[in-house]
C-alpha cells in the first residue's frame, strides 16, 4: 500500500527532525525536473507570482528571492516532512514517529509537489511556494499539469514496483491528485473521505479533513498496512468508519461536530 499526501503552503520556521542513525535524508528522484522548473520560475517577478498564485506582496518577494538562489542554496535543503507545517502535517506528526514507522513511511508515503513532482518524506527540499494548480507556462504547456504529464504517475508506478504495493490510498487534495495521470497509473485508488455531522448535515470541514489525511498516513505507516480493509480501523480525531456511506473505493469516516 502506498499513500499520497499534498504538500503544505505553510513552512516551518525552524525545521527539525531527529532521525535514527541508519536513516539518512534522501534526494528527490525528480530533482532534475525541479531544477528545470526553478529556472523558469527564476524569471518571474513578484507581480507575476502574485498574479499566478494569489499571494501577498511580501510572500511573492520572498519566493522571488528563493527561486533566485535555488541552485546555489542546495545546502539549505531539509527533509520534506520537517519543512512542511500545515494541517496535514500536524496530523502526520512525523517528529513523534518511532524509527520503524519512519522507515516504513520513507518507502510507502509519497508527497505530491508542484515543484518536485513526487517526494519521499525524507527527501531534502528547499523552501518554496509553487502550487500544483499554478498556470506556469513551460516548454511542455501552459500549466504545471502539462509540465508533469505522466511523470508523477510513472514515479508512483515505480514506487509500487519497488515496494510491492498493490493499492494507492489518496490522502491528497483534488488539486494535487489531478497531477497523477490516472490513465498512466497502474494502481487501483482508494480515496478516504472525512465528513463532519452537525445539526443533521454531513459535510467536509477542511481543517479537520486535512488533519485526518495526515493522521491516516501515519496510521498506515505505524501499522504497516497492506490490506485496504484495515483502513476501517482508523479512529483519529474523533472519526470512525461509516459503512452505510462507504464504497470500496471511497471509505467514509464520520465525526460529530
UniProtKB/Swiss-Prot annotation:
User: Gene Ontology cellular component?
Assistant: cytosol
The record's section on InterPro entries has: YaaA (IPR005583)
Top-rank lineage group of the source organism: Bacteria
Q: According to its UniProt record, what is one Pfam family this protein matches?
A: H2O2_YaaD
Q: Which GO terms describe its biological process?
A: response to hydroperoxide
Family of the protein in this entry: Belongs to the UPF0246 family.
Name listed for the protein in its UniProt record: UPF0246 protein Rsph17029_0026
What is the species listed in this Swiss-Prot or TrEMBL entry? Cereibacter sphaeroides (strain ATCC 17029 / ATH 2.4.9) (Rhodobacter sphaeroides)
